[in-house]
Amino acid sequence: MTEHTKNSILIIGGGLIGLSIAYVFARNDFKVSILSKKRNESAGFVAAGMLATHAEGLEDELFKFGQQSQRLIPEWIKNIEQDSGIECGLRECGIVVPFKNMKDLRKFPTYKYGKYLSQKDLQTEINGINSIWKHGLLFAEDGQIDNRRRLMRALERACSLHGVKFQEGAEVQDLIIERNKIIGAKVLNATGELNEINCFKAILCSGAWSKKILNKIPVSPIKGQMLSIQGPANFLKRILFGPNTYLVPRDDGLIIVGATVEKDSKFNQGNTPNGINQLQNGIRSLLPEAMNWPQMEHWWGFRPSTPDFKPIIGKSDIKNLFIATGHYRNGVLFSAITSDIIYKLVQDKSLTDIEISFLEKFSLKRFEM
């Protein structure tokens, strides 16, 4: 087994949450290792990157969690960009949510935070929007990060420059527990060899695959299919967030179109005709002109979902094993605050009252009652 010290951290999972947590520890002089089976399959590489606390219609503790994280993100991204030398595409571009009638608008959980848009206003904000949309809400403070092309690469580089050790192709077969304390993991490497890697403390952040590592974690995959189209630069300046489809414009005119919600897909890979057709119908319903723009890519991924669609963050009942998973649709939005709270928790640093309340609300124990 490999040697370890009290300032060593083992991260199980190399997706966005794992990288975010690894980054904050490495930046504070910890020796960090990341175990990842296939990092490019993580949700962080396939998500649209929206920062949509208000436009998602989040409620209660999820809304507060999103608000807190959105406040942290500018400084967090600034540090990542400085350490990596890679610009991450953070844009407070605003998000428009369209409605067909006022009844639906008034039922929207966060409508009081948005600016009301008449149909004329909608057409001004979203050039070419379908005339079926009569009203809208503009959430000007919501925005996006270009996670797929920039943020993930920037985090990987920043982690590497801070000494993080990556073990790609490392599939965790089992956790090694002694006297209810984690001391390591049994890992099948890319060449088929079974090794034991020990640790002082570990953080499990394996997204949709978390249950395969620790069965008591009730996380399941919800597949999402996406595609991108190339529009004219600056044609779409706001994100357009419809009821079943969203259009996320990057600064070069590329538009991310998402996403299907396939609850019974398990880990079935690949795009399907039905999935692509659903996305195309969504484009047509929101921005008909975009149906004539060239399609660039299509891909899929697996959101880590819990029974109540809220993340699991905090201590496990195994000493020195911490959990950060189940972020479902909001991994990009929640990454900054998750990494911050986990760092404080692992270090026994003081937490604010609202951080303590988040840990209570998002504890694994809520599923054991």
Can you name each region flagged by the protein language model?
Residues 50-128, 134, 282:
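Dinucleotide-binding Rossmann-like beta1-alpha1 core, especially the glycine-rich loop
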Residues 45, 233-319:
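Active-site lid/adjacent beta-loop-alpha segment flanking the redox-cofactor pocket in flavoenzymes
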Residues 26-45:
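Glycine-rich FAD pyrophosphate-binding loop
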Residues 138-193, 197-200, 205:
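Helical element adjacent to the flavin cofactor pocket in flavoenzyme catalytic cores
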Residues 293-369:
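C-terminal catalytic lobe of FAD-dependent flavoproteins
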Residues 189-241, 272-273, 289:
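Central helical "cap/lid" subdomain
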Residues 57-58, 86-96, 119-162, 260-266, ...:
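Helix-loop-beta segment of a Rossmann-like dinucleotide-binding subdomain
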Residues 3-15:
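Beta1/beta-strand and adjacent pyrophosphate-binding region of the FAD-binding site
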